[in-house]
């Protein structure tokens, strides 16, 4: 579920900072106009019946100008989509703030239902 929470946070952060409308591509990517803008990976360590820790890795193509030929048809960046560079710090701040909000609600309610109908990441 943390992968989906992170995806929702990425989509909300990008929308807030850039005005673009990315969508979540189940289960761990975000896309703009069908092209991948972000990948999310989670890794969990467990011990018996408990979770020791979870690491969430988020990679957003921010100011990438070109991609290798083998992925150039399926990948994009915020710079390519906007036509100009984007400052990373405000984007990181927006994503982290959204993640904190979504994660708090997820923990409070115990499932994703509370997020699906209220988030910026839901389909329009």
Label every model-predicted segment.
Residues 25:
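Gly/Ser-rich oxyanion-binding loop with an adjacent helix/lid
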Residues 120-124:
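A short, hydrophobic C-terminal helix/tail in secreted or cell-surface proteins
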